[in-house]
């Protein structure tokens, strides 16, 4: 009758709702039992009172067991002569209150219930430290780095993560850290629950598989991936200088119809994922992976289009981007950049890197074709609306000048550059925007 019931870890790892402990008694004692449990703050309001097959009633309680003293109190004082015992509800039914909650509210309720069941006082500090948003990859949830930072969490053990996963309906949890500054864009992600970090994600009909603990995936880039997928690149050869797991390589191959892509990547984990993603999307025969530092790439005079998808800046890749463009016809550079637009802050000219000073001599004259008043044109010469922010246009013009200089030195003759389009991707803060500059680069006709 009075045996304690403890929820097993095996049940938690199945991905089903975590079993809830309940007090079972006869229907005629249900109301008195419930009132007592509510007064003692032991009644679980997130799950329904259930009727058992034998006609008795199960009242869900907080925590993983109910001390014997409470069972004795129920039998002897709350309802003298009553009988009760503990059981487990393997598939507890959420209460109407719980069903009406948002995922964040449900998480708060479930975690607070579990924490208090462990004898730890729930506080405003702990509630403020819960995540408000996350990324879902199938049965894995990726939490942001700014949650679960309070010291109290560290003493609660791994069952905390089982509770979080159950509340949010997943089987695995990971927590994001800062991206590695080593240039490989390796995310500092910690796996909190589960035995591996491999996930699948479908984006615009393209299947990506990758390990979230080793490779990045940005949901915020979907607008740019959709845009490049809509381009007509039939017959074109592309160079993707920062291919990753195939963020842009795959849309260009699968949807834009590129003839061939040279994909550069130096993160070995991303290369494994990229190779796999090319295979599962049926385009492996139209892509060559170049593993290593793209600044040492031996390709030249080959590309109709170059993707420079690295933020906050892809400047280190500009010289090699100029090198791989076709010498006879040129091509288009898609240059990603984070641009600041703080009110009252003057735009500073781009610094010339040490590498460029050593390897690229700057000519006296360059040829550019900057459009006035912030307007841009597409590849058909159609006027587009002005850039939303003047800082974007000023950065684009500065980048255009730098690229024109590099092109003349790399190819030994003047080139003409033209801003085709400035595409906003997303904002990281009120005054930091991720944009993409489409820059057309063409060799000037030889004179006489």
Curated annotation (Swiss-Prot):
Protein name: tRNA wybutosine-synthesizing protein 2 homolog
One Pfam family of this chain: TRM5-TYW2_MTfase
Gene from which the chain derives: TRMT12
Domain of life: Eukaryota
EC number(s) given by UniProt: 2.5.1.114
Family: Belongs to the class I-like SAM-binding methyltransferase superfamily. TRM5/TYW2 family.
GO molecular function, one term: tRNA 4-demethylwyosine alpha-amino-alpha-carboxypropyltransferase activity
Keywords: S-adenosyl-L-methionine, Transferase, tRNA processing
Pathway: tRNA modification; wybutosine-tRNA(Phe) biosynthesis
Binding site for S-adenosyl-L-methionine: 218, 225, 265, 293-294
PROSITE patterns: SAM_MT_TRM5_TYW2
A biological process term (GO) from this entry: tRNA methylation
Role: S-adenosyl-L-methionine-dependent transferase that acts as a component of the wybutosine biosynthesis pathway. Wybutosine is a hyper modified guanosine with a tricyclic base found at the 3'-position adjacent to the anticodon of eukaryotic phenylalanine tRNA.
Annotated Gene Ontology cellular component terms: cytoplasm
Catalyzed reaction equations: 4-demethylwyosine(37) in tRNA(Phe) + S-adenosyl-L-methionine = 4-demethyl-7-[(3S)-3-amino-3-carboxypropyl]wyosine(37) in tRNA(Phe) + S-methyl-5'-thioadenosine + H(+)
Gene3D superfamilies, A to Z: Met-10+ protein-like domains, Vaccinia Virus protein VP39
């Amino acid at each position: 009758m009075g045996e304690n019931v403890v929820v097993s870890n095996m049940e938690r790892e199945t991905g089903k709702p975590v079993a809830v402990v309940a007090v079972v008694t006869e229907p005629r004692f249900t109301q008195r039992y419930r009132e007592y449990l509510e007064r003692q703050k032991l009644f679980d309001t997130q799950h329904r009172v259930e009727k058992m097959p034998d006609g008795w009633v199960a009242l869900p309680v907080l925590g993983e067991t109910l001390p014997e003293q409470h069972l004795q109190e129920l039998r002897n004082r709350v309802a003298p002569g009553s009988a009760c015992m503990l059981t487990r509800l393997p598939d507890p039914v959420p209460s109407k209150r719980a069903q009406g909650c948002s995922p964040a509210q449900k998480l708060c309720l479930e975690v607070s219930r579990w924490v208090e069941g462990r004898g730890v006082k729930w506080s405003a500090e702990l509630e403020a430290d819960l995540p408000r948003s996350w990324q879902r990859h199938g049965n894995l949830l990726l939490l942001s780095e700014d949650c679960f930072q309070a010291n109290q969490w560290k003493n609660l053990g791994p069952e905390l993560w089982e509770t979080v996963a159950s509340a949010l309906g997943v089987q695995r949890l990971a927590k994001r850290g800062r991206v590695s500054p080593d240039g490989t864009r390796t995310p500092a992600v910690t796996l909190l629950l589960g035995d591996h970090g491999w996930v699948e994600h479908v984006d615009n009909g393209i299947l990506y598989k990758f390990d979230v603990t080793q490779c990045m995936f940005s949901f915020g880039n979907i607008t740019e991936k959709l845009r490049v997928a809509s381009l007509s690149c039939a017959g074109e050869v592309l160079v993707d200088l920062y291919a990753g797991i195939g963020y842009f390589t795959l849309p260009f191959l699968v949807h834009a119809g590129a003839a061939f892509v040279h994909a550069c990547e130096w993160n070995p984990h991303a290369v494994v994922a990229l190779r796999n993603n090319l295979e599962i999307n049926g385009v492996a025969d139209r892509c060559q992976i170049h593993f290593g530092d793209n600044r040492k790439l031996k390709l030249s005079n080959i590309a109709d289009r170059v993707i420079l998808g690295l933020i906050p800046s892809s400047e280190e890749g500009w010289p090699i981007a100029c090198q791989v463009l076709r010498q006879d016809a040129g091509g288009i550079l898609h240059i990603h950049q984070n641009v600041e637009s703080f009110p009252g802050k003057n735009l500073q000219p781009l610094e010339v890197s040490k590498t460029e000073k050593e390897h690229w001599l700057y000519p006296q004259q360059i040829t550019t074709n900057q459009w006035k008043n912030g307007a841009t044109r597409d590849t058909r010469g159609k006027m587009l609306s002005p850039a939303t922010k003047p800082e974007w246009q000023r950065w684009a013009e500065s980048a255009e000048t730098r690229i024109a200089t590099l092109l003349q030195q790399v190819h030994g003759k003047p080139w003409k550059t033209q801003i085709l389009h400035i595409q906003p991707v997303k904002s990281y803060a009120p005054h930091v925007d991720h944009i993409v500059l489409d820059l057309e680069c063409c060799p000037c006709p030889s004179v006489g």
